[in-house]
């Protein structure tokens, strides 16, 4: 007798990774999943519904969910038949730029969505998972949760917070047969990333000194665009990594999705002092930009695999 489909609640499904993941799970050939695809603004649901096709209303339903609102979370969960078996914390927002030009309100918004939004959802589904002694919490983190990136101070901090919180929680939840998986993409070529880079390239960043603005506009932004061109993944590859994690009988705590990006994260892991990563990145960006360009060209030459192999 076939097992009942698992209910998967996904936040942030209006575009990008969340949308692609919801559609792929809903079209699972074995029909292992009943997907609740959520977004803050239901006015943006048309793209998701069109991509879902015949799965809409069958293995996929669309619901409103604002991860920054207790009331919205409670309302969403009350409309789900049964319990949430798999929670995918995908909703997120970015913030890039010189620190002096960023408001505290903007920084708090990032943490409210990226960190506290994820915590709010976990608190809501955890009692049911503990009672049933089973469940899987998947968190879409980032390689920026492993290493800081220049001019991404606040975004990286929100991802570092996720990594520490969920690694700590994983120890307790293993006793309840509940697994936590932190999925850590590198650069992903999505509408989210494209809009963010376009917006910051036009921003004024008041209160920032001219030298820092020069570094941001003339060094960081061109290097960031080249990084996306060289090692950026498409959402489908990242989604496949997430699907592999969800379908695993023994889900990993961490899963990086981009093999081409791994040399950059290795710089931090091989040196416990942290100096190797900071000094190498500083040297490449500020002193040897030609060497940085050469390295990015090497990563993009096509001799390294980019797709995630099923496990």
Swiss-Prot record:
Instruction: Give EC number(s), comma-separated.
Output: 1.1.1.300
Give start-end ranges for the coiled-coil region(s): none
Instruction: Name the catalysed reactions.
Output: all-trans-retinol + NADP(+) = all-trans-retinal + NADPH + H(+)
* Keyword vocabulary terms for this entry: Lipid metabolism, Membrane, NADP, Oxidoreductase, Sensory transduction, Transmembrane, Transmembrane helix, Vision
User: A single GO CC term, please?
Assistant: plasma membrane
The record's subcellular locations are: Membrane
- Which sites bind NADP(+)? 9-18
Q: Which GO terms describe its biological process?
A: estrogen biosynthetic process; retinol metabolic process; steroid biosynthetic process; visual perception
The active site lies at 155
Q: Any idea which positions bind substrate? A: 142
How would you describe this protein's topology in the membrane? Multi-pass membrane protein
Tissue specificity is:
Detected in photoreceptor outer segments in the retina (at protein level).
Pfam families in alphabetical order: adh_short
Q: Which SUPFAM superfamilies match?
A: NAD(P)-binding Rossmann-fold domains
The UniProt entry, under CDD domains, shows:
type1_17beta-HSD-like_SDR_c
Membrane-traversing stretches:
86-106, 137-157, 169-189
Q: Which PROSITE patterns does the entry mention? A: ADH_SHORT (PS00061)
Which family is it part of? Answer: Belongs to the short-chain dehydrogenases/reductases (SDR) family.
- Function in brief: Retinol dehydrogenase with a clear preference for NADP. Converts all-trans-retinal to all-trans-retinol. May play a role in the regeneration of visual pigment at high light intensity.
Protein name (record): Retinol dehydrogenase 8
Q: What organism does the UniProt record list as the source? A: Homo sapiens
């Amino acid at each position: 007798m076939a097992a009942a489909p698992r209910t998967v609640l996904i936040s942030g499904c209006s575009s990008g990774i969340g949308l692609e993941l919801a559609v792929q799970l809903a079209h699972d050939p074995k029909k292992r999943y009943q997907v609740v695809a959520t977004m803050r603004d239901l006015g943006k649901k048309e793209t998701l519904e069109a991509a879902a096709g015949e799965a809409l209303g069958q293995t996929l339903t669309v619901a409103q969910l604002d991860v920054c609102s207790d009331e919205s979370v409670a309302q969403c969960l009350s409309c789900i038949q049964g319990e949430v078996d798999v929670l995918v914390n995908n909703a997120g927002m970015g913030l890039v730029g010189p620190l002096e030009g960023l408001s505290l309100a903007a920084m708090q918004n990032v943490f409210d969505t990226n960190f506290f939004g994820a915590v709010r959802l976990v608190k809501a589904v955890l009692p049911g998972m503990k009672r049933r002694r089973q469940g899987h919490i998947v968190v879409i983190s980032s390689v920026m949760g492993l290493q800081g990136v220049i001019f991404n101070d606040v975004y990286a901090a929100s991802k570092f917070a996720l990594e520490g919180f969920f690694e700590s929680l994983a120890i307790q939840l293993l006793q309840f047969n509940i697994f936590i998986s932190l999925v850590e993409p590198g650069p992903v070529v999505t509408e989210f990333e494209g809009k963010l880079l376009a917006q910051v390239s036009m921003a004024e960043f008041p209160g920032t000194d001219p030298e820092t603005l020069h570094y941001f506009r003339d060094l960081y932004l061109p290097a960031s665009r080249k990084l996306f061109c060289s090692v950026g993944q498409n959402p489908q590859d990242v989604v496949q990594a997430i699907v592999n994690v969800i379908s695993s009988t023994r889900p990993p705590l961490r899963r990086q999705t981009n093999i081409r990006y791994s040399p950059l994260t290795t710089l931090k892991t091989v040196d416990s002092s942290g100096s190797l990563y900071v000094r190498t990145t500083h040297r490449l960006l500020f002193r040897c930009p030609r060497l940085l360009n050469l390295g990015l060209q090497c990563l993009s030459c096509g001799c390294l695999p980019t797709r995630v192999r099923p496990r």
